[in-house]
């Protein structure tokens, strides 16, 4: 999938990416005008160290494919379409290394100890890269027979969780990735996103092209709850496509809330995790007039929404009673929105990038209708042929010749 616009929050640091660039700024105070901008297209390009089937040197544009913070926010990593993994230190911002990867990547995550970053690619492999040795080569950890779409780790770093195009979620032991603890099976389309619940480290959230949000006990592979998004009738726009694949699952520890953003819909779904009953409770739909690019929770402030609107690129939502409501623009929000407006070209240029999941759905072929039609035509032809054989030949006057009982036709 091509690069697209994205939002990431960790602590008081906000990152917005678009195309080959990202910008990082602080949301701690309106007086903090620190701003870090990085352009991957200007980063160093090396010959590929981990050569695979692809060309030795990929001439990509530098478009960012995936990015993430480490747990503490001390590190930030991204991958681009030039097959590079770029690692940053955030306090202060500094590029630590630029390393090559074997394939274009689809997702990445830091392990909880922040010693390694795991990178999943389109060929189904997961590589680990050292953070402590920022120039070290990658190590192959595990592989699928299908494209990987997301990767996560358990809070204790014991398990690596991977989601692929062929409907599977695999739970592997980190110390011995060839040893599989379980599979979480039940999705009927590609698994687009997975997220371990921070407040319940044994639970996993997943979403798929089948239009469901599911809750799992991942070590046993047991499904605890399944929510069909299409069943929430008030959410369905008759003019909108009826396919729901999550492009983002965000979790807010403070309220045990889940925000779900689906690909191609200007809607954010809000659920609440009932840990005692081990189920998801639908709370609210947040509808927008513009395309929503990404969402992220900030623990002390609420839900940040990045949208395709130059006048108001960022919107902040907080729960007020039982309903989520937009917050009047604060000085911090005004400051960050002003920064985005000043760099709007990088976002606007990436808005049309094909980062959707539409190409991942199973191809369906309706060959039954054509088969039945051809079968009916064939039977009709056979019936007409039999009728012609049974009809007696015509006489001299054009009428069928009548034969007497017992009279047989003579043939030469």
Curated annotation (Swiss-Prot):
Effect of residue 83 to A: Slightly reduced formation of N(7)-methylguanine in tRNAs
Keywords from the named record: Acetylation, Chromosome, Disease variant, DNA damage, Epilepsy, Intellectual disability, Nucleus, Phosphoprotein, Repeat, tRNA processing, WD repeat
Annotated Pfam families: WD40
GO cellular component: chromosome; cytosol; nucleoplasm; nucleus; tRNA (m7G46) methyltransferase complex; tRNA methyltransferase complex
A GO term for molecular function: tRNA methyltransferase activator activity
Annotated phenotype, changing residue 170 to A: Reduced formation of N(7)-methylguanine in tRNAs
Mutagenesis or variant effect for residue 103 to A: Does not affect formation of N(7)-methylguanine in tRNAs
Modified residues (Phosphoserine): 391, 411
Pathway: tRNA modification; N(7)-methylguanine-tRNA biosynthesis
Subcellular location: Nucleus; Chromosome
Disulfide bonds: none
Impact reported for residue 166 to A: Abolished formation of N(7)-methylguanine in tRNAs
Lipid biosynthesis in keyword set: no
Transmembrane annotation, as ranges: none
Family matches, as InterPro entries: Trm82, WD40/YVTN_repeat-like_dom_sf, WD40_repeat_dom_sf, WD40_rpt
Location of region: Disordered: 377-412
Induction: Amplified and overexpressed in a number of cancers (at protein level).
Effect of residue 122 to A: Does not affect formation of N(7)-methylguanine in tRNAs
Effect of residue 147 to A: Reduced formation of N(7)-methylguanine in tRNAs
Additional notes on this entry: In the context of cancer, overexpression of the METTL1-WDR4 methyltransferase complex promotes cancer progression by driving oncogenic transformation. The METTL1-WDR4 methyltransferase complex drives oncogenesis by mediating the formation of N(7)-methylguanine at position 46 (m7G46) in some tRNAs, in particular Arg-TCT-4-1 (TRR-TCT4-1), leading to increased translation of mRNAs, including cell cycle regulators that are enriched in the corresponding AGA codon.
Disease affiliated with this protein: Galloway-Mowat syndrome 6: A form of Galloway-Mowat syndrome, a severe renal-neurological disease characterized by early-onset nephrotic syndrome associated with microcephaly, central nervous system abnormalities, developmental delays, and a propensity for seizures. Brain anomalies include gyration defects ranging from lissencephaly to pachygyria and polymicrogyria, and cerebellar hypoplasia. Most patients show facial dysmorphism characterized by a small, narrow forehead, large/floppy ears, deep-set eyes, hypertelorism and micrognathia.
Family to which the UniProt record says this protein belongs: Belongs to the WD repeat TRM82 family.
Record note on quaternary structure: Non-catalytic component of the METTL1-WDR4 complex, composed of METTL1 and WDR4. Interacts with FEN1; the interaction is direct.
This protein's name: tRNA (guanine-N(7)-)-methyltransferase non-catalytic subunit WDR4
Organism whose genome encodes this protein: Homo sapiens (Human)
